[in-house]
């Protein structure tokens, strides 16, 4: 069957934390128009991205873009409140489908989000959050490099950093399984790819990477791999 839709993260893509360039975003819109594709932009990290990051929905005028936003990354992960922006006719169909498939979102949670957004402090909260994440990412990148890992990409913002293991080390899945025995949870590259071949990189969350045990484990594991 011919593809009908493309799902993507236009900014702070998971797992790399990178964003589309304006030129790449424009090419994707041209591609969607050429082949009649819907573009579902899962843009849940937008508030954590630089202000100049391209916005597919704005560039497209919601012609082929279905924009998905969320507050779970900036207010609370337990809120589970988001929103969709799209063409009016499609919005009516999506609302009907949502009512049939899952009824409504919690009204209490929606009212809480409305209060947070209208009380006047949300923008300052985002500024503090992005500043804390920037400092945490900087520390994480420096510590991973010191342990002997190499960054796959320089994140544009957000919380994720991906780093590769040196050559000659076990797969990231093997290391992650060993880490679990030490009480450390890692996200191996195998979680984020479709092929079955072993990966040798991890996705790290800067918001949860301040524990010194993580870096001691990485240093010890890599030393053991090089010695064998």
Show where each model-derived region lies.
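PLP-dependent enzyme catalytic core of the Aspartate aminotransferase-like
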Residues: 181-182, 193-228
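Helix C-cap/helix->beta junction micro-motif
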Residues: 34-35, 63, 182
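Active-site phosphate-binding strand-loop segment of PLP-dependent enzymes
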Residues: 1-49
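Conserved glycine-rich beta-strand-loop-beta hairpin in the small C-terminal domain of fold type I
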Residues: 130-141, 151-164
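Active-site PLP attachment segment
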Residues: 58-93, 105-108
């Amino acid at each position: 069957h011919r593809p009908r839709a493309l799902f993507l993260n236009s900014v702070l893509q998971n797992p790399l934390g990178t964003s589309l360039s304006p030129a790449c975003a424009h090419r994707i819109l041209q591609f969607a128009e050429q082949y009649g594709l819907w573009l579902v932009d899962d843009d849940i990290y937008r508030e954590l991205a630089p202000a100049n990051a391209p916005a597919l929905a704005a560039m497209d005028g919601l012609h082929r873009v279905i924009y998905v936003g969320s507050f779970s990354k900036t207010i609370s992960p337990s809120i589970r409140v988001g929103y969709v922006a799209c063409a009016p006719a499609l919005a009516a169909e999506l609302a009907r489908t949502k009512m049939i498939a899952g009824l409504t979102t919690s009204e209490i949670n929606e009212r809480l989000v409305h209060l947070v957004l209208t009380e006047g402090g949300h923008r300052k909260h985002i500024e503090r959050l992005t500043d804390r994440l920037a400092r945490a990412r900087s520390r994480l990148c420096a510590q991973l490099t010191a342990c002997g890992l190499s960054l796959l990409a320089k994140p544009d913002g957000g919380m994720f950093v991906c780093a590769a293991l040196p050559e000659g080390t076990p797969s990231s899945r093997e290391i992650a399984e060993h880490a679990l025995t030490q009480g450390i949870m890692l996200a191996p590259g195998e979680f984020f790819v479709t092929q079955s071949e072993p990966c040798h990189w991890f996705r790290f969350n800067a918001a949860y990477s301040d524990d010194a045990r993580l870096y001691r484990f990485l240093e010890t594991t890599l030393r053991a791999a090089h010695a064998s």
